[in-house]
Design a protein with these regions (language model features):
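Alpha-helix-loop-beta-strand connector modules within alpha/beta enzyme cores
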Residues: 61-85, 220-226, 280
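N-terminal small/glycine-rich loop or linker at the start of catalytic domains
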Residues: 2-26
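Active-site beta->alpha loop and helix N-cap motifs at the rims of alpha/beta catalytic domains
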Residues: 68-72, 76-147
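Conserved small/polar residues in nucleotide/adenosyl-binding loops
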Residues: 298-303
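Conserved, mostly hydrophobic/aromatic
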Residues: 34, 52, 110, 182, ...
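Catalytic alpha/beta core domains of metabolic enzymes, predominantly
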Residues: 113-246, 250-257
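Glycine-rich, proline-tolerant flexible connector loops at the mouths of alpha/beta enzymes
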Residues: 48-68, 201, 263-265
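Active-site mouth loops of central-metabolism enzymes
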Residues: 18-33, 88-92, 146-148, 232-233
Length: 308
Protein backbone atom coordinates (compact mmCIF):
# COMPACT_ATOMS: atom_id res chain seq x y z
CA UNK A 1 0.00 0.00 0.00
CA UNK A 2 1.39 3.39 -0.95
CA UNK A 3 2.11 5.84 1.82
CA UNK A 4 -0.13 8.92 1.89
CA UNK A 5 1.70 12.03 0.77
CA UNK A 6 2.39 14.70 3.37
CA UNK A 7 -0.04 17.60 3.32
CA UNK A 8 1.46 21.08 3.50
CA UNK A 9 -0.48 23.94 5.06
CA UNK A 10 -0.19 27.22 3.14
CA UNK A 11 -0.84 30.32 5.23
CA UNK A 12 -1.38 33.60 3.41
CA UNK A 13 -0.83 36.97 5.11
CA UNK A 14 -2.45 39.42 2.75
CA UNK A 15 -1.54 42.89 4.04
CA UNK A 16 0.21 43.02 7.44
CA UNK A 17 1.61 46.12 9.11
CA UNK A 18 5.19 46.24 7.83
CA UNK A 19 4.82 47.55 4.30
CA UNK A 20 3.13 50.83 3.48
CA UNK A 21 0.77 51.75 0.63
CA UNK A 22 3.31 53.87 -1.24
CA UNK A 23 5.61 50.84 -1.62
CA UNK A 24 3.22 48.95 -3.88
CA UNK A 25 -0.04 49.84 -5.56
CA UNK A 26 -1.00 46.18 -5.13
CA UNK A 27 -0.99 46.24 -1.31
CA UNK A 28 -4.63 45.89 -0.18
CA UNK A 29 -5.81 48.69 2.08
CA UNK A 30 -9.61 48.97 2.26
CA UNK A 31 -11.73 46.27 3.91
CA UNK A 32 -13.06 45.17 0.53
CA UNK A 33 -9.55 45.00 -0.95
CA UNK A 34 -8.28 42.94 1.98
CA UNK A 35 -11.26 40.59 1.90
CA UNK A 36 -11.02 40.14 -1.87
CA UNK A 37 -7.28 39.44 -1.64
CA UNK A 38 -7.90 36.85 1.06
CA UNK A 39 -10.66 35.14 -0.93
CA UNK A 40 -8.44 34.89 -4.01
CA UNK A 41 -5.58 33.50 -1.91
CA UNK A 42 -7.86 30.86 -0.44
CA UNK A 43 -9.00 29.90 -3.91
CA UNK A 44 -5.38 29.44 -4.94
CA UNK A 45 -4.70 27.03 -2.08
CA UNK A 46 -4.23 28.91 1.20
CA UNK A 47 -5.99 27.08 4.02
CA UNK A 48 -5.16 29.75 6.64
CA UNK A 49 -5.72 33.48 6.14
CA UNK A 50 -3.68 35.65 8.49
CA UNK A 51 -5.44 39.00 8.75
CA UNK A 52 -4.49 42.54 9.65
CA UNK A 53 -6.56 45.64 8.91
CA UNK A 54 -5.74 49.14 7.70
CA UNK A 55 -7.34 52.55 7.88
CA UNK A 56 -9.19 52.71 4.55
CA UNK A 57 -8.26 56.39 4.10
CA UNK A 58 -4.49 56.38 4.61
CA UNK A 59 -3.57 52.69 4.85
CA UNK A 60 -2.16 52.92 8.37
CA UNK A 61 -2.44 49.66 10.35
CA UNK A 62 -5.40 49.58 12.71
CA UNK A 63 -6.88 47.11 15.17
CA UNK A 64 -10.27 48.82 15.21
CA UNK A 65 -12.88 46.02 15.36
CA UNK A 66 -15.19 48.13 13.20
CA UNK A 67 -12.71 47.87 10.32
CA UNK A 68 -12.37 44.10 10.81
CA UNK A 69 -16.18 43.93 10.70
CA UNK A 70 -15.91 45.03 7.08
CA UNK A 71 -13.47 42.20 6.30
CA UNK A 72 -14.40 39.03 8.17
CA UNK A 73 -18.01 38.31 7.14
CA UNK A 74 -17.19 38.61 3.44
CA UNK A 75 -14.34 36.11 3.74
CA UNK A 76 -16.39 33.63 5.76
CA UNK A 77 -19.21 33.86 3.24
CA UNK A 78 -16.95 33.07 0.29
CA UNK A 79 -14.41 30.59 1.72
CA UNK A 80 -14.01 27.88 4.32
CA UNK A 81 -10.45 28.95 5.07
CA UNK A 82 -9.33 29.17 8.69
CA UNK A 83 -9.35 32.77 9.91
CA UNK A 84 -6.23 33.84 11.82
CA UNK A 85 -6.56 37.32 13.35
CA UNK A 86 -3.39 39.09 14.40
CA UNK A 87 -2.72 39.98 18.03
CA UNK A 88 0.59 41.47 16.89
CA UNK A 89 -1.08 44.37 15.12
CA UNK A 90 1.79 46.80 14.79
CA UNK A 91 4.84 47.25 17.05
CA UNK A 92 3.72 50.86 17.47
CA UNK A 93 0.47 49.77 19.21
CA UNK A 94 -0.21 48.92 22.83
CA UNK A 95 -0.96 45.33 23.75
CA UNK A 96 -4.50 46.38 24.65
CA UNK A 97 -5.03 47.77 21.14
CA UNK A 98 -3.51 44.69 19.55
CA UNK A 99 -5.86 42.30 21.35
CA UNK A 100 -9.13 44.03 20.46
CA UNK A 101 -10.22 42.26 17.24
CA UNK A 102 -9.41 38.76 18.51
CA UNK A 103 -11.25 39.55 21.74
CA UNK A 104 -14.34 40.74 19.87
CA UNK A 105 -14.54 38.18 17.07
CA UNK A 106 -13.21 35.11 18.90
CA UNK A 107 -11.59 33.50 15.83
CA UNK A 108 -10.62 29.87 15.58
CA UNK A 109 -6.98 30.97 15.34
CA UNK A 110 -4.97 34.05 16.29
CA UNK A 111 -1.30 34.89 16.06
CA UNK A 112 0.78 35.33 19.22
CA UNK A 113 4.28 36.80 19.21
CA UNK A 114 6.47 34.89 21.65
CA UNK A 115 8.97 37.51 22.75
CA UNK A 116 10.00 41.15 22.83
CA UNK A 117 12.47 42.21 20.17
CA UNK A 118 13.99 45.02 18.17
CA UNK A 119 11.93 45.51 15.00
CA UNK A 120 14.03 47.29 12.41
CA UNK A 121 12.12 48.40 9.33
CA UNK A 122 14.21 51.50 8.61
CA UNK A 123 16.48 49.80 6.01
CA UNK A 124 13.50 49.98 3.64
CA UNK A 125 14.15 53.73 3.46
CA UNK A 126 17.13 52.87 1.25
CA UNK A 127 14.75 51.40 -1.35
CA UNK A 128 11.69 53.63 -0.94
CA UNK A 129 12.03 57.40 -0.70
CA UNK A 130 8.70 58.88 -1.79
CA UNK A 131 5.62 58.45 0.39
CA UNK A 132 2.08 59.68 -0.03
CA UNK A 133 1.31 59.74 3.69
CA UNK A 134 3.42 61.25 6.47
CA UNK A 135 2.94 58.27 8.78
CA UNK A 136 4.72 55.94 6.34
CA UNK A 137 8.15 57.53 6.64
CA UNK A 138 7.63 58.16 10.35
CA UNK A 139 6.91 54.48 11.03
CA UNK A 140 10.08 53.41 9.27
CA UNK A 141 12.27 56.06 10.90
CA UNK A 142 10.94 55.30 14.39
CA UNK A 143 11.83 51.64 14.05
CA UNK A 144 15.48 52.58 14.70
CA UNK A 145 14.49 52.95 18.36
CA UNK A 146 11.57 50.53 18.59
CA UNK A 147 11.07 47.49 20.80
CA UNK A 148 8.18 45.23 19.86
CA UNK A 149 6.89 44.56 23.36
CA UNK A 150 5.75 41.01 24.12
CA UNK A 151 6.52 40.41 27.79
CA UNK A 152 5.67 37.25 29.70
CA UNK A 153 2.72 39.11 31.20
CA UNK A 154 1.54 40.23 27.76
CA UNK A 155 1.74 36.68 26.43
CA UNK A 156 -0.07 35.23 29.44
CA UNK A 157 -2.84 37.81 29.15
CA UNK A 158 -3.42 37.00 25.49
CA UNK A 159 -3.32 33.25 26.20
CA UNK A 160 -6.00 33.59 28.86
CA UNK A 161 -8.27 35.61 26.59
CA UNK A 162 -7.79 33.04 23.86
CA UNK A 163 -8.67 30.20 26.20
CA UNK A 164 -11.86 31.92 27.34
CA UNK A 165 -12.85 32.41 23.68
CA UNK A 166 -11.84 28.91 22.50
CA UNK A 167 -9.24 30.49 20.24
CA UNK A 168 -6.05 28.59 19.51
CA UNK A 169 -2.79 30.24 18.49
CA UNK A 170 -0.21 30.40 15.77
CA UNK A 171 2.93 30.98 17.85
CA UNK A 172 5.18 33.38 15.96
CA UNK A 173 8.84 32.79 16.84
CA UNK A 174 11.34 35.29 15.45
CA UNK A 175 14.31 33.87 17.32
CA UNK A 176 15.52 30.81 19.23
CA UNK A 177 14.69 32.44 22.57
CA UNK A 178 11.04 32.61 21.51
CA UNK A 179 10.96 28.81 21.33
CA UNK A 180 12.19 28.67 24.91
CA UNK A 181 9.54 31.20 25.91
CA UNK A 182 6.94 28.92 24.34
CA UNK A 183 8.35 25.96 26.25
CA UNK A 184 8.01 27.96 29.47
CA UNK A 185 4.27 28.35 28.94
CA UNK A 186 3.92 24.71 27.91
CA UNK A 187 5.63 23.65 31.15
CA UNK A 188 3.17 25.83 33.08
CA UNK A 189 0.27 24.05 31.34
CA UNK A 190 -0.95 27.30 29.78
CA UNK A 191 -0.47 25.84 26.30
CA UNK A 192 -1.49 22.35 25.28
CA UNK A 193 -0.35 20.41 22.21
CA UNK A 194 -0.67 20.10 19.36
CA UNK A 195 0.48 23.61 18.59
CA UNK A 196 1.35 25.52 15.45
CA UNK A 197 4.73 27.30 15.36
CA UNK A 198 5.41 29.94 12.73
CA UNK A 199 9.18 30.50 12.47
CA UNK A 200 10.00 33.93 11.07
CA UNK A 201 13.33 34.47 9.28
CA UNK A 202 15.08 37.52 7.93
CA UNK A 203 13.51 40.40 9.85
CA UNK A 204 16.08 42.79 11.33
CA UNK A 205 16.02 42.15 15.08
CA UNK A 206 15.28 38.44 14.79
CA UNK A 207 17.04 35.35 13.48
CA UNK A 208 18.66 35.56 10.05
CA UNK A 209 17.68 33.80 6.85
CA UNK A 210 20.68 31.51 6.32
CA UNK A 211 19.95 27.80 5.81
CA UNK A 212 21.82 27.13 9.06
CA UNK A 213 19.39 29.46 10.86
CA UNK A 214 16.47 27.44 9.53
CA UNK A 215 18.04 24.17 10.65
CA UNK A 216 18.94 25.58 14.07
CA UNK A 217 15.34 26.63 14.61
CA UNK A 218 14.08 23.22 13.51
CA UNK A 219 16.54 21.27 15.66
CA UNK A 220 15.70 23.35 18.72
CA UNK A 221 11.94 23.00 18.24
CA UNK A 222 12.28 19.25 17.74
CA UNK A 223 14.30 18.94 20.94
CA UNK A 224 11.88 21.04 22.97
CA UNK A 225 8.57 19.78 21.59
CA UNK A 226 9.14 16.47 19.83
CA UNK A 227 6.08 15.53 17.80
CA UNK A 228 3.76 17.93 19.65
CA UNK A 229 3.87 20.70 17.06
CA UNK A 230 3.29 21.61 13.42
CA UNK A 231 6.11 23.69 11.98
CA UNK A 232 5.62 26.51 9.50
CA UNK A 233 8.11 29.01 8.14
CA UNK A 234 8.09 32.39 6.50
CA UNK A 235 10.97 34.24 4.92
CA UNK A 236 10.82 38.02 4.90
CA UNK A 237 11.35 39.93 1.68
CA UNK A 238 13.69 38.37 -0.86
CA UNK A 239 13.98 35.24 1.30
CA UNK A 240 10.33 34.27 0.89
CA UNK A 241 10.39 31.59 -1.81
CA UNK A 242 13.90 30.33 -1.07
CA UNK A 243 13.07 29.59 2.55
CA UNK A 244 9.66 28.19 1.65
CA UNK A 245 11.38 25.71 -0.64
CA UNK A 246 14.05 24.78 1.91
CA UNK A 247 11.51 24.50 4.69
CA UNK A 248 9.13 22.33 2.71
CA UNK A 249 12.00 19.97 1.92
CA UNK A 250 12.60 19.69 5.67
CA UNK A 251 8.97 18.97 6.55
CA UNK A 252 7.67 22.50 7.12
CA UNK A 253 4.41 24.16 6.26
CA UNK A 254 4.78 27.56 4.57
CA UNK A 255 3.52 31.11 4.71
CA UNK A 256 3.49 33.70 1.93
CA UNK A 257 1.62 36.92 1.19
CA UNK A 258 2.20 40.64 0.72
CA UNK A 259 2.63 41.11 4.47
CA UNK A 260 5.92 39.23 4.24
CA UNK A 261 7.16 40.24 0.78
CA UNK A 262 5.97 42.64 -1.90
CA UNK A 263 7.83 40.73 -4.60
CA UNK A 264 7.10 37.75 -6.82
CA UNK A 265 10.66 37.59 -8.19
CA UNK A 266 13.72 39.86 -7.98
CA UNK A 267 12.77 43.37 -9.06
CA UNK A 268 9.15 42.50 -9.88
CA UNK A 269 6.27 43.40 -7.58
CA UNK A 270 3.71 40.71 -6.89
CA UNK A 271 0.32 41.82 -8.17
CA UNK A 272 -1.47 39.90 -5.42
CA UNK A 273 -0.98 37.50 -2.55
CA UNK A 274 -2.75 34.99 -4.76
CA UNK A 275 0.24 35.09 -7.13
CA UNK A 276 2.56 34.14 -4.28
CA UNK A 277 0.26 31.34 -3.13
CA UNK A 278 0.15 29.99 -6.67
CA UNK A 279 3.93 30.15 -6.99
CA UNK A 280 4.62 28.37 -3.70
CA UNK A 281 1.92 25.80 -4.46
CA UNK A 282 3.66 25.00 -7.74
CA UNK A 283 6.95 24.56 -5.86
CA UNK A 284 5.32 22.22 -3.33
CA UNK A 285 3.67 20.16 -6.03
CA UNK A 286 7.01 19.83 -7.81
CA UNK A 287 8.19 18.22 -4.55
CA UNK A 288 5.25 15.78 -4.87
CA UNK A 289 3.61 17.27 -1.78
CA UNK A 290 -0.13 17.62 -1.31
CA UNK A 291 -1.71 20.95 -0.35
CA UNK A 292 -3.70 20.89 2.88
CA UNK A 293 -7.32 21.99 2.81
CA UNK A 294 -8.91 23.77 5.78
CA UNK A 295 -10.45 20.43 6.75
CA UNK A 296 -7.13 18.59 6.66
CA UNK A 297 -5.47 21.50 8.49
CA UNK A 298 -7.96 21.08 11.32
CA UNK A 299 -7.28 17.36 11.42
CA UNK A 300 -3.53 17.97 11.54
CA UNK A 301 -3.43 20.64 14.20
CA UNK A 302 -6.37 21.70 16.27
CA UNK A 303 -10.11 21.72 16.79
CA UNK A 304 -11.80 24.65 15.12
CA UNK A 305 -14.72 26.83 16.13
CA UNK A 306 -17.11 28.78 13.92
CA UNK A 307 -17.13 32.12 15.69
CA UNK A 308 -16.16 34.25 12.68
Amino acid sequence: MSKEKRKVIITCAVTGAIHTPSMSKYLPVSPDEIADAAILAAGAGASILHLHARDPINGKPTQDPAVFEGILPKIKKETDAVINITTGGSPHMTVEERMMPASVFKPELASLNMGSMNFGLYPMLDRFSEFEHTWERDNLEKSRDLVFKNTFQDIETILKIGKSNETRFEFECYDISHLYNLKHFVDRNLISPPFFIQSVFGLLGGIGAHPEDLMHMKRTADRLFGSDYQWSILGAGKNQMTLASMGAAQGANVRVGLEDSLWIEPGKLAQSSKDQVTKVRNILEEFSLDIATPVSYTHLTLPTTKNV
